[in-house]
Amino acid sequence: MEIRIGSRKSSLAMWQTCYVEDKLKQSGITTSILPIDTRGDQVLNVAIAKIGSKGVFTEELEAKLADGDIDIAVHSAKDMPSVLPDGFELIAFTDREEPADVLVSHKKDLDISDSSRPVTIGTSSVRRQALLGRFYPHVRTVDIRGNVQTRVLKMKEGLCDAILMAYAGIHRMGMDDLIVHTFSPDTFIPPVGQGCIAVEASSRLAAEKKEAIRACINHPASETCLLAERAFLKRLEGGCSIPAFALARLNGDRLTLSGGLMSLDGKKFIFNTRAGAGSQATAIGTDLGNHVLENGGAALLAEIRKQQTT
């Protein structure tokens, strides 16, 4: 059996793809990798929320899936829209890395909690900007785009004092020595899917290949958590462009999902938790999404989208 894998070209994307490829090879499956440029990689002077596409990092890979040029596409789960286009599905999730956000800097004495010292932090994530506004209002933010190495270089050249990034990406790139602060995911809640790698396929992929891929790659506990988080985001009709957040944890068969929504400045904050059996992951996520919408979330979403279009 041969599996053709599509991937973005960045170093982190290729690391994730090689991780998936190694899992397949260990089971005797022949593989090949096709690197693909996406609009999210090409348009670096515009914030993700303003590019105007939910699939900014996925559309080009999905085109290759639809054409039959590749069998699967490897993504950061956090980049995946909450609703996939017709004809595509997520067939596997890897064992999740630590989902926390970290502060990365070449200035080892940087203390984000010290409000007496001006600090500029690079991030283009609306969620991270909102969380900084809520918990660290003294911090100034600046948009920063590009792959991990590009962002680190921009920081060292003076664009900012530090960068706010996912621990998973920094760790996978071997840059742990640049971490100066790790944010607690219980308060600085990550986006849906952070730390997990997702495998996407055409719905037409042969059942034999799909089953073989799942057997090699899928991590059931991570999948359960991602199903809950993605159901929550789907109910909000959200993606990377809104400051929504959610984190599910599985203890035995008991699933706990915490999540919510913020205003762009972080001042308005809607948050709640739901729990239940892991087998009810999707229902738990939908229930939390309904709660958020019914308790000010619908009006807040309308306000956010109005601000983003003006």
Curated annotation (Swiss-Prot):
Keywords: Porphyrin biosynthesis, Transferase. GO terms for molecular function: hydroxymethylbilane synthase activity. CDD domains: PBP2_HuPBGD_like. Pfam families: Porphobil_deam, Porphobil_deamC. Binds 1 dipyrromethane group covalently. The keyword S-adenosyl-L-methionine does not apply. SUPFAM superfamilies: Periplasmic binding protein-like II, Porphobilinogen deaminase (hydroxymethylbilane synthase), C-terminal domain. Its cofactor is dipyrromethane. GO terms for cellular component: cytoplasm. Pathway: Porphyrin-containing compound metabolism; protoporphyrin-IX biosynthesis; coproporphyrinogen-III from 5-aminolevulinate: step 2/4. Tetrapolymerization of the monopyrrole PBG into the hydroxymethylbilane pre-uroporphyrinogen in several discrete steps. Belongs to the HMBS family. Monomer. This is Porphobilinogen deaminase. The gene is hemC.
